Amino acid sequence: MNIFIVGPMGSGKTTVGKIVASELFLDFYDTDGTIEEKTGVTIDWIFDIEGEGGFRKRETLVLKDLVALNSIVLATGGGIVIEDENRELLASRGTVFYLHTPLNTQIERTAKDKDRPLLKNKNASEVLINLQNARQFLYEEVSDYIIDTENKSGSEVAKEIVKLVKNYG
């Protein structure tokens, strides 16, 4: 059983994924973390040197490796759904949970984080609105379940996912 978590930046994918993996005794992976591990540099550095296009290519390569594994929980980067190939990989190899997160929550959570290349030196609210408009339907398209994260802690969201997995597989 593979569990894939998608959603915008600031939705809590990594936090929730770690809890779900622990509860279900599965291995946890994070696409961004795996990219940093393999390259030895930060996502921010990759964006600066290779641009978003270079990062997306790396992301797809890492995703191919990770979806080939079994019994994992995978927290994906917010933009992973942009590429058709990535959506196909996710949909064909596991159960996909979309963490639907209101814009105001995303803004609050990302305001303190300086490691968000897409928000660097930009109006964060405007960027997040544009990203939501461009990606929300892609998250919905690829997901098996949509989890509303509004006013919920990471552990509350994780409990919902664990319950769904235990009840419906």
Question: What residue ranges belong to the model's regions?
Answer:
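NTP-dependent small-molecule kinase module
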Residues: 19, 23, 69, 133-169
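Walker A/P-loop
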Residues: 14
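Conserved substrate/cofactor phosphate-moiety recognition/catalytic segment
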Residues: 22-60
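Glycine-rich phosphate-binding loop used to anchor ATP phosphates in small-molecule kinases
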Residues: 54-95, 150
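Hydrophobic anchor at the beta1->P-loop junction of P-loop NTPases
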Residues: 5
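P-loop (Walker A) phosphate-binding loop of NTP-binding proteins
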Residues: 8
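A glycine- and Lys/Arg-enriched "phosphate-lid" helix/loop adjacent to the NTP-binding pocket
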Residues: 92-136
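ATP-binding Walker
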Residues: 11
